[in-house]
Amino acid sequence: MPPKKKKVTGLIKLQIQAGAANPAPPVGPALGQHGVNIMEFCRAYNAATESQRGWVIPVEITVYEDRSFTFITKTPPAAKMILKAAGIEKGSGEPHKTKVAKITEAQVREIATTKLPDLNANDLDAAAKIIAGTARSMGVTVEG
């Protein structure tokens, strides 16, 4: 007889610095209200994201009835990747009036390749269009 499926009691979505999860807010309160062992999650997350230090990594935590959990890490947000590629701190306050930086078509394709598993796109061209749109809405011009 196959083992019984565990009942899911919660789904938590967080964006945490890679390798820097700690029990302080926002991690502690979000997990605490579901009864998850916070330090156990922090250790597992930090080990899983150690190689991506410096990035903000979104994570989806599934909490089960017996208070156990599983988590899936995603790729860094497209906006953060665009900022890093353009070498700027933040996007434009008025994106369609003031342009703050330029990135090349090649950089857009590189970001799209990285983000492809998380995007709702069937191929690289569609993913590149999504990334280019995100860049435009941040006041970053795409050249090429």
UniProtKB/Swiss-Prot annotation:
One of its GO terms (molecular function) is structural constituent of ribosome. The keyword rRNA-binding applies. GO terms for biological process: translation. Pfam families: Ribosomal_L11, Ribosomal_L11_N. GO terms for cellular component: cytosolic large ribosomal subunit. CDD domains: Ribosomal_L11 (cd00349). Part of the ribosomal stalk of the 50S ribosomal subunit. Interacts with L10 and the large rRNA to form the base of the stalk. L10 forms an elongated spine to which L12 dimers bind in a sequential fashion forming a multimeric L10(L12)X complex. This is Large ribosomal subunit protein uL11.
